[in-house]
């Protein structure tokens, strides 16, 4: 059965047809509407999926934010602007005329990455370190989403009670320190205004402050992984995202994790599917795996 998979991100919308063998075809992308209004998103989604819907039998959505009863929510409502409580599932069912499911994008990515692991892995955690920090948890072969869709939002666990205020309202969240946005916000002097990509370039050139910001991010993620190991006893952790997959970053995380006591050690690996993980994970869920 062919699935029309859609990935709704902060900067772009992606859609593709995916068959039961996870082959992707006719991938399309559009920028996410800057206005963040229901009408703008509705029209963008319509333009995105109209050329694809005739060949699909169902729709699967991976979206930023929290998906609760088919509606779009967020820990930081300001991120969604006028899209808070946007009826995501209902909107796509109307546009495509097909049965639709929706899941958080990091949860979807976790499900895709889980299916790429050896069969003896039943418990894994996926962590994406990018503009923000997100995640997904698979326990005994089942994806955890939670009644309210909150499961796996690991970026909003505590890193430093005296740290910066996070967009969710808490103080010292992992995301506020370790994410690309958090690193950029902490940059000072000649690095002020630099984005995470630039910080990694400067760190590679030996810039002391840039190296510290990257190292601090890796250490915070490593400590979070130790907490995750203690909470889930997962067999492995898969790391993705633009920061997580940046050159040398995973090695730093692994080195910091090895400084933790042995019971908190866990195998780390880089994400396999990268920017297709959300599309593939959502399609897998629609193709018979239930939430």
From Swiss-Prot:
Annotated positions binding Zn(2+): 156, 166, 168, 173
Pfam families referenced in this protein's UniProt entry, alphabetically: ROK
InterPro entries per UniProt: ATPase_NBD, ManNAc_kinase_bac, ROK, ROK_cs
Keyword annotations from UniProtKB, A to Z: ATP-binding, Carbohydrate metabolism, Kinase, Metal-binding, Nucleotide-binding, Transferase, Zinc
Disulfide bonds: none
GO molecular function: ATP binding; N-acylmannosamine kinase activity; zinc ion binding
Reaction catalysis annotation: an N-acyl-D-mannosamine + ATP = an N-acyl-D-mannosamine 6-phosphate + ADP + H(+)
SUPFAM superfamilies assigned: Actin-like ATPase domain (SSF53067)
Residues binding ATP: 5-12, 132-139
PROSITE patterns listed in its UniProt record: ROK
EC id: 2.7.1.60
Keyword Nucleotide-binding belongs to the record: yes
GO-annotated biological processes: N-acetylneuraminate catabolic process
Tree of life domain: Bacteria
Associated pathway: Amino-sugar metabolism; N-acetylneuraminate degradation; D-fructose 6-phosphate from N-acetylneuraminate: step 2/5
Primary enzyme class: transferase
Oligomeric form and interacting partners: Homodimer.
UniProt xrefs under PANTHER family: N-ACETYLMANNOSAMINE KINASE, ROK (REPRESSOR, ORF, KINASE) FAMILY
Record function comment: Catalyzes the phosphorylation of N-acetylmannosamine (ManNAc) to ManNAc-6-P.
Family: Belongs to the ROK (NagC/XylR) family. NanK subfamily.
Protein name per its UniProtKB record: N-acetylmannosamine kinase
Protein species of origin: Salmonella agona (strain SL483)
Taxonomic lineage from the root: Bacteria, Pseudomonadati, Pseudomonadota, Gammaproteobacteria, Enterobacterales
